[in-house]
């Protein structure tokens, strides 16, 4: 079977290598699972992370990849109501991306759920969520 390797890198975000079979569907019908961490307010890094989500969805096809974006630290501001990335976050949510805000960061920045974009999820600790996902076998992309 021919295989292709896609290398994701750039602007501080990296993923080792993802091998995709020509069928574009993981073996045995299992879903690929990817968690992306963004801990910076830099718009170009957020754009890159959101582009990665679009690319992964296109590479694997609808329903074949489960994706979670975890925002923590300085990156949490991009999930606030006034964020310029709001429309792209909404688009990601519409295609099934789990967008998670770190509640530790929110408390430290005195933010509550009313300050945040509608439709996002919340995790007690962003780093804890990433560790949990890695233990569950998810691929990890950091930013």
Residue ranges and their predicted role:
Residues 1-23:
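N-terminal export signals
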Residues 21-143:
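Secreted/extracellular ectodomain signature
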């Amino acid at each position: 079977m021919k295989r292709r390797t896609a290398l994701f890198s750039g602007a501080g975000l990296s993923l080792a290598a993802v091998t995709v079979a020509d069928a574009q569907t993981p073996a045995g019908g299992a879903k690929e699972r990817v968690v992306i961490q963004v801990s910076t307010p830099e718009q170009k890094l957020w754009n890159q992370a959101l582009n990665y989500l679009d690319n992964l969805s296109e590479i694997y096809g609808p329903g074949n990849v489960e994706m979670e974006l975890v925002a923590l630290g300085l990156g949490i501001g991009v999930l606030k109501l006034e964020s310029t990335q709001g429309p792209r976050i909404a688009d990601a949510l519409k295609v099934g991306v789990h967008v998670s805000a770190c509640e530790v960061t929110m408390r430290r920045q005195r933010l509550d759920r009313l300050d945040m974009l509608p439709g996002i999820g919340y995790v007690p600790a962003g780093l804890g969520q990433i560790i949990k996902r890695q233990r569950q076998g998810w691929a990890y992309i950091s930013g």
